[in-house]
Amino acid sequence: MSLLRSASLLLVVVTAALPPCTLGYSLHDGSRLDDVIAEFTAERRPRRLATPAQRRLMGLTEEQHKTVQFYLDKLRELGNRRHPESYNKDSPKNEAYKWRKQMRDDLKTELLNPEKYGRHFEGDIILFPEQAKQIYENALKTGQRRVKRKFIGSDLRRWDPTRPIIYSFDGSHTSREQRIIELALEHRHNITCLNFVRNDNANKGNRIVFTDVDGCASNVGRHPLGEEQLVSLAPECIRLGVIAHEVAHALGFWHEQSRPDRDQFVNVRWENIDKDSKGQFLKEDPDDVDNAGVPYDYGSIMHYRSKAFSRYDDLYTISTFVTDYQKTIGQRDQLSFNDIRLMNKIYCSNVCSRKLPCQRGGYTDPRRCDRCRCPDGFTGQFCEQVMPGYGAVCGGRIQVNSGWTRFSSPGYPREFKEGQECSWLLVAPPGQVVEMQFIGEFEMYCKVRHSLCMDYVEVRNSTDFANTGMRYCCYGTPSTSIRSATTDLVVLFRSFYRGGRGFEARARALPANGQWASWTPWTPCTASCGACGSRMRTRVCPHGACPC
């Protein structure tokens, strides 16, 4: 297939069966050459001249469809029995119900995660009968979904990475929509060892057929009998992030929040989940899971958003234990670094004969074995360099000490421009950590009702910079004081959608074992002889209890 030059920023303007809107997406392919701008106004076309049976079956036989629906109904019943925290209080006569219903209808016009509104398992997963049966039977036994791993376990459903993945279109999409879909496939080609080849004449063997018969939907993994499988992409799904999400399903990936370790990172708010959707939140079985050592990722493109499947769209169904990660989950802009890392571990681990000494959480790039694939914010052969600013002179390595050092978005307090990016690496002296605080006015574009950042300042303060960090956006200065787990802290400024006021922050170095406050004044003496009284001071430690 023809390869597009690596792109850091890709803007797509889509008007198709939705109110006009601008949708921007960023593609980090490891290098910057050009901005690729695909602009189109797709004609308002019919969904797809498909029969009701085609919409209902989605590639299954009538008997297979009945079997899947049987087990999905059982899962709904099981979810309601296990989690009866809520019940349907809606009444058409209730004014609050009418207001909330209108709010829900208004929110649907934005469709940040259109795949959530599907009628399939978890909204967009088309199950085969044996998958539906396995999920239900193991949920019945263990209370969890017994799925082999975040990546599907069966070799029968794994694609052969040494052979091209054949795909075609069935005529549902305009030529411009087809080009957007192919851009998403080309991006995946650039960042993995997988190759996609279009062949509209293929009529046998495994292949992906892009259609528009049932919203955003896909099977999970390769068809085990070597037949075609459908990936449905309706007009509202023609966005790079949503396409990447559905193609990831086709390659064998489940949703992130279904991992067995999810309860260490998020809290499922069962009382806020729609009564027919509780079965969508069951977990994988921890006894039979392998996530290839890749940790839970708040920024995964496979993660539900905060209010997915809620009884009303203003209720949270997923809360992050660390509050500052709340606006990170649910993004549909691009594959996260860990999404790509897991895909390469599953499919491409044997491509390069030598593993490079990559830094900052990077790994040997299976597409270019002489270089490392680096987390956002880093570049260079071994990820040893901070990514330079894009569209502005900004970012870089900052050595901090006990005094405050300030840094800000481009032009602050004037507005930054759409498309500008900055990356900072803040470094404290050995044995110390970095403390960071936001100061001054703060403004970054967000979807307030969805609790989701569109443009953001991301802070990575963990021991692994491959992990997506805490994203800050919207209006009002964040009050959080952030401390790093090591001597280093990464700050990423990303403006994909629009300009704004931006941010200003300050940083300093603190002792790793905590910082003592000043002594308080002596208290008054309690005896006339003097030489008595007391004074005190406190110590604030960045991570847990202070050492004695």
From Swiss-Prot:
Q: What is this protein called?
A: Zinc metalloproteinase dpy-31
Cite the Peptidase M12A domain residue spans from the record: 150-349
What's this protein's function?
Metalloprotease which cleaves the carboxyl terminus of procollagens to mature collagens. Probably involved in cuticular collagen maturation.
Against InterPro entries, the record matches this protein to: Astacin-like_dom, CUB_dom, EGF-like_dom, MetalloPept_cat_dom_sf, Metallopeptidase_nem, Peptidase_M12A, Peptidase_Metallo, Sperma_CUB_dom_sf
Annotated GO MF terms: metalloendopeptidase activity; zinc ion binding
Task: Please share the entry's free-text remark on the cofactor.
Answer: Binds 1 zinc ion per subunit.
Q: Does the keyword Signal apply?
A: yes
One GO term under biological process is: proteolysis
Any Pfam family hit: Astacin
Q: What is the lineage of its organism?
A: Eukaryota, Metazoa, Ecdysozoa, Nematoda, Chromadorea
Q: Where in the cell is it found?
A: Secreted
- Which species is listed as the source? Haemonchus contortus (Barber pole worm)
Active-site residues, record numbering mapped to chain: E246
Per UniProt, where does Zn(2+) bind?
H245, H249, H255
